[in-house]
């Protein structure tokens, strides 16, 4: 996951055919601590190909927003996968 800032935050976004998932986590001395998770239905992909960019962007924004709300952190960069 992308290193988001000095707090060792990591952010990953998975854009899939059925859903978009955003996870916000941090590295600690004990391991990885998940701070927030956002899941949103995806309707802009078909067979791993983006067919409706506006719907895909909206789903990503919503998943990120949910993860930010849960974690209390703001996402500035992330690793993104499309499947």
Residue ranges of predicted features:
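Entry/capping segment at the start of metal-dependent catalytic domains
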Residues: 1-7
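Short glycine-aspartate micro-motif
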Residues: 8-14, 77-79
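A short acidic Gly-Thr/Ser loop motif
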Residues: 13-19, 82-83
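Short, solvent-exposed loop/edge-beta patches enriched in aromatic
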Residues: 16, 71-72
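Short glycine-rich, Thr/Ser-proximal phosphate-binding strand/loop in the N-terminal lobe
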Residues: 18-51
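Short beta-strand-loop/turn "lid" adjacent to the catalytic site in phosphate-handling enzymes
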Residues: 45, 72-83
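Phosphate/oxyanion-binding active-site loops and adjacent basic polyanion-contact surfaces
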Residues: 52, 56
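Short, well-ordered amphipathic alpha-helical segments that serve as non-catalytic structural scaffolds
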Residues: 57-68
């Amino acid at each position: 996951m992308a290193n988001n800032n000095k707090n060792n935050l990591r952010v990953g976004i998975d854009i899939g055919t059925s859903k978009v998932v955003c996870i916000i986590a941090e590295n600690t001395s004990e391991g990885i601590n998940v701070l927030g998770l956002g899941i949103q239905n995806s309707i802009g992909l078909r067979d791993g190909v983006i067919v409706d960019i506006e719907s895909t962007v909206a789903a990503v924004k919503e998943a990120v927003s949910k993860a930010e709300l849960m974690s209390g952190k703001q996402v500035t960069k992330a690793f993104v996968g499309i499947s």
